[in-house]
Amino acid sequence: MVLNINSFYKNCRGEFMRAVFIYHKNNQRMEKFYKNLLNEPDFCRICDDCYNCRGNWTFKNNVKNIVIEEVYEEFVDNPYDYLPELPEGDICIAQLHEDLLYELPLLLKEKGYKALIVPSETPHDLSLALRRDLKRVCSNYNIEFENPKPFCSLEKKEGNEYINKFIDYFKIGKPELEIEVENGLIKDVKVKISAPCGETYYIAKRLKGKAIDDLKEEIANAHHNYPCLASMEMDKELGDTILHKAGYIAFEVVEKALKK
């Protein structure tokens, strides 16, 4: 499969960032990450009293998704039977069969990508061994690499020039909020950075008008109702479920905003 979309992009690094999502068919988590950045009118329909709390922005001219067929084999002899030709870009966000992931950095290097992000939403999305290999291979190609577990744990790091720009540009990663309190009640909440799935906008809406003492229950309910799509399976590395880790992050960012 060849995607002839390079002319769609401006080659204006620093002023125009290009992100490409690549994942297998039926990957609902990656589909949600991608569609969050499109911000189409029907993306979020969770509230009956919708007043478009997300706003009228879109990154439809900055993002593309490449959906490839599912791989059922445990080992893939020729990953290039599945991997398509990639468009040029800056950042690649990928969830793929591990044999395909291992070959991906070379393709990214050839197309001028500066970073690879492989989010883990289940304990099986990326093995620790392949994480080490990808980090090494990407380093050899001068490609930044991160494996956030979950995606909403992605935050800026020293040395990650392009991933830091990705967070600033698309306003996704570890959430950041600005909260205004009046007489013990939440008067207003502004989303500075959203979780990649878009949940932060829903949490912000749910918090408005609530008493500070009631926030813990409100955040927990919002996290499960949105819903968070992270796995409920125990992750050995975390010693907890990734769903719970995402929930802890949601609590943490609200507490941090209240202290400012």
Swiss-Prot record:
<keyword id="KW-0808">Transferase</keyword>
<dbReference type="GO" id="GO:0006231">
    <property type="term" value="P:dTMP biosynthetic process"/>
</dbReference>
<dbReference type="InterPro" id="IPR003745">
    <property type="entry name" value="DUF166"/>
</dbReference>
<comment type="function">
    <text>Is able to catalyze the biosynthesis of dTMP using dUMP, tetrahydrofolate and formaldehyde in vitro, i.e. a reaction equivalent to that catalyzed by bacterial thymidylate synthases (EC 2.1.1.45). However, M.jannaschii like most methanogenic Archaea lacks folates, thus the physiological cosubstrate is unknown but is likely one of the non-methylated methanopterin biosynthetic intermediates.</text>
</comment>
<keyword id="KW-0489">Methyltransferase</keyword>
<comment type="pathway">
    <text>Pyrimidine metabolism; dTTP biosynthesis.</text>
</comment>
<dbReference type="GO" id="GO:0006235">
    <property type="term" value="P:dTTP biosynthetic process"/>
</dbReference>
<dbReference type="Pfam" id="PF02593">
    <property type="entry name" value="DUF166"/>
</dbReference>
<keyword id="KW-0545">Nucleotide biosynthesis</keyword>
<protein>
    <recommendedName>
        <fullName>Thymidylate synthase</fullName>
        <ecNumber>2.1.1.-</ecNumber>
    </recommendedName>
</protein>
<dbReference type="GO" id="GO:0032259">
    <property type="term" value="P:methylation"/>
</dbReference>
<dbReference type="GO" id="GO:0004799">
    <property type="term" value="F:thymidylate synthase activity"/>
</dbReference>
